[in-house]
Amino acid sequence: MATFVELSTKAKMPLVGLGTWKSSPGQVKEAVKAAIDAGYRHIDCAYVYHNENEVGEAIQEKIKENAVKREDLFIVSKLWATFFEKSLVKKAFQNTLSDLKLDYLDLYLVHWPQGFQAGNALLPKDNKGKVLLSKSTFLDAWEAMEELVDQGLVKALGISNFNHFQIERLLNKPGLKHKPVTNQIESHPYLTQEKLIQYCQSKGIAVTAYSPLGSPDRPYAKPEDPVVMEIPKIKEIAAKHKKTVAQVLIRFHVQRNVVVIPKSVTPSRIQENLQVFDFQLSEEDMAAILSFNRNWRACDLLDARTEEDYPFHEEY
């Protein structure tokens, strides 16, 4: 079966990529090198992960070793929400590009639909704890990002954490030059996202699933939170296929033609997470996994939930 999705630009995006959120700078370099050695060609990055410099070092070392060519890699990064002012977009992008030590990106995403006040704080708040928004919106940021495509610095643009109303606003923007090719969203058995995935795919927008394993290592996890990796029925499906739970959770997305970016810094797991193209989940398996949906999010940025353009109040 295909190991990539074809984007609306005709570029091929590998279905499984390495996620780097929560990978500490000390570990992420070795993780990226192990991933490239294991056959990964898609690396998902972001300014806000504070580790793009090390990711870039790993990519450069592998290119120098002739382990991989730049044109065979698919490198993604994201514009953080404090850089929506047009004058700031290019600076933020150049920071990312120089940290990654590349001369172009394959895909550049708007990381979050709300614009936050520019400055050093990633989530700026007033003294009452209220999140401070920017006067600039994702539509302003998009115009500046389109210039990066026109200049040959980025091959394609996308979005992340957008609901379908926000996507409609972008698609209907007067003078839109470059359509979003992908929407990167949280998805796993407790957040199956069927309606949003169907909507995106119907518009020619590929979907990438982040936190496919339920983000068990998120720093703010509460003891009562559900644990995706511990669902007995999914353990049963994994045993039946002689696969790990993680492999089943990754395969679940691959079979929906959804790109998936599991994060790991452990070489054996990094390898294992790519070994999902040699088995098939049955219709019953897929239906069983989908049945666990409860619209539970590991990543909800609740601090911003009372502000305009918060994406998760809508059904999809």
Curated annotation (Swiss-Prot):
Q: Name one GO cellular component term.
A: mitochondrion
Q: Which residues bind substrate?
A: H111
Reactions that this protein is recorded to catalyse? an alditol + NADP(+) = an aldose + NADPH + H(+); prostaglandin F2alpha + NADP(+) = prostaglandin H2 + NADPH + H(+)
Q: What induces it?
A: Castration resulted in a marked decrease in the level of the mRNA coding for the protein, whereas administration of testosterone to castrated males resulted in a marked increase.
Active site at which residues?
Y49 (proton donor)
Lineage, top-rank taxon, reads Eukaryota
Protein's recorded name: Aldo-keto reductase family 1 member B7
Encoding gene per record: Akr1b7
